[in-house]
């Protein structure tokens, strides 16, 4: 871990870490580059937060925090390695992020992944922010849970087309149109008595 800290310091990152209660083990590490911090201060309105679970060599969750500029370009704000995927760990990470803002305004919109602990931590640290679910995660759930409801490939494809139109609607009228169209075409479950 000391090698990581030395490397972060060498390339100019600001970083924080916390250890276990007995001080024998590093639990969580948060790091932010000064240039990312400057962008974050200029564009604090939208946060995208994703935790990649155990995809690295050491099987440690990596939290990525991304910002969005006024021209819709994304930029990396910060990263954190956390020992557990619990609200306490995510809260600590988000508190470090908030601390890095000093007195700059807080995010208005946060798009977390669907992890309940992360969503609760966001609500704790940034209570005034609005939340939106990530389209990619919603789409994955549709593929996972809805496909079996459609008896034919044609009906499934029609649903996916209508779903795409719904989520890409640019007006309330279009949204309501596609919403009602999807509702009217959804398979109905028969009432059991």
Show which residues each predicted segment covers.
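Structured beta-rich ligand-binding regulatory domains in large eukaryotic signaling proteins
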Residues: 70-73, 86-87, 113, 126
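Eukaryotic short linear interaction motifs
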Residues: 39, 55-57, 71-75, 89-90, ...
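A short, conserved beta-strand element enriched in hydrophobic/aromatic residues
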Residues: 65, 75-82
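Extended amphipathic alpha-helical interaction segments
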Residues: 1, 6-11, 15, 98-101, ...
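Short, conserved catalytic/metal-binding motifs centered on acidic residues
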Residues: 49-53, 74, 110-113, 137
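Active-site beta-loop-alpha junctions of metal-dependent nucleic acid enzymes
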Residues: 56-58, 79-103
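Conserved, non-catalytic sequence blocks in retroelement Pol enzymes and Pol-derived host proteins
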Residues: 52-55, 81-87, 111, 148-150, ...
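Structured nucleic-acid-interacting core domains from mobile-element enzymes and related host factors
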Residues: 1-63, 68-70
